[in-house]
UniProtKB/Swiss-Prot annotation:
Receptor for MSH (alpha, beta and gamma) and ACTH. This receptor is mediated by G proteins which activate adenylate cyclase. Required for expression of anticipatory patterns of activity and wakefulness during periods of limited nutrient availability and for the normal regulation of circadian clock activity in the brain. It holds the Pfam family 7tm_1. It is a multi-pass membrane protein. Residues 1-37, 101-118, 182-186, 269-277 are extracellular. The chain crosses the membrane at residues 38-63, 76-100, 119-140, 161-181, 187-210, 246-268, 278-301. This is Melanocortin receptor 3. InterPro entries: GPCR_Rhodpsn, GPCR_Rhodpsn_7TM, MC3-5R, Mcort_3_rcpt, Melcrt_ACTH_rcpt. Gene3D superfamilies: Rhodopsin 7-helix transmembrane proteins. GO terms for biological process: adenylate cyclase-activating G protein-coupled receptor signaling pathway; circadian regulation of gene expression; G protein-coupled receptor signaling pathway, coupled to cyclic nucleotide second messenger; homoiothermy; locomotor rhythm; phospholipase C-activating G protein-coupled receptor signaling pathway; regulation of blood pressure; regulation of feeding behavior. It comes from Homo sapiens. The gene is MC3R. Belongs to the G-protein coupled receptor 1 family.
Amino acid sequence: MNASCCLPSVQPTLPNGSEHLQAPFFSNQSSSAFCEQVFIKPEVFLSLGIVSLLENILVILAVVRNGNLHSPMYFFLCSLAVADMLVSVSNALETIMIAIVHSDYLTFEDQFIQHMDNIFDSMICISLVASICNLLAIAVDRYVTIFYALRYHSIMTVRKALTLIVAIWVCCGVCGVVFIVYSESKMVIVCLITMFFAMMLLMGTLYVHMFLFARLHVKRIAALPPADGVAPQQHSCMKGAVTITILLGVFIFCWAPFFLHLVLIITCPTNPYCICYTAHFNTYLVLIMCNSVIDPLIYAFRSLELRNTFREILCGCNGMNLG
């Protein structure tokens, strides 16, 4: 609960109002001896969860409503929006659960609290794996768009994209269950860290290759006479690649402190400086939730079509041409 996913809880204590229902293994309760923990009000988690939920629902509604957005990339963005919703909703519900546990009106057995903790931890784990897999799928989609432009519509069809999305979520569901079943093992943390860095390396390689190709292509186009359709098409492909690169950068920025937290738990659990860093776990959770809030803003900023659809849904502008 407001804890890192899938790791064992050792005691049913609550260090402060924004902490976990059960103190996770890596929350390092002794950290207060070395540095002061940052108190984050429960309202922050709840507010971020609600904003993220509304924003990502808007993204999904926009893609469903606008036929021009029925393409593999936007379907992958919808899947990423669901992953963003999952992590924010889990933390918001967790905050509500903490408030209920702290109230004098209801009491719960420790076993029930442990079950709820496992459910919310599983949701966070599933969201993490889903986010990484969807970002990778989008990277592959942009890669195919740039390097196999003439065959793109036969290689990456809507049906194939939807099948891949279903496969991603089935895999994520299995991972969530496995992480909970083996939550007592440190191998869970090792697997999460390994997956994160392996996926980041793979996506980084794809994007470096794409932008090197784009740079070479721009030089070649500049040396040729103007040809209608060539430059605009390439510009459109690269604009999509830039958008996903921004998404990836924000994802790394928001999730990196969490993964550094996991790395320190494995490598130096008793070092005072490591303990001090891990004392601020709730801050890293807030960053993760901020990622879920920022992503829809990036979609809107980078896509005029999506932005217009948002405006139509929110304002009811019937005169807008959505093609």
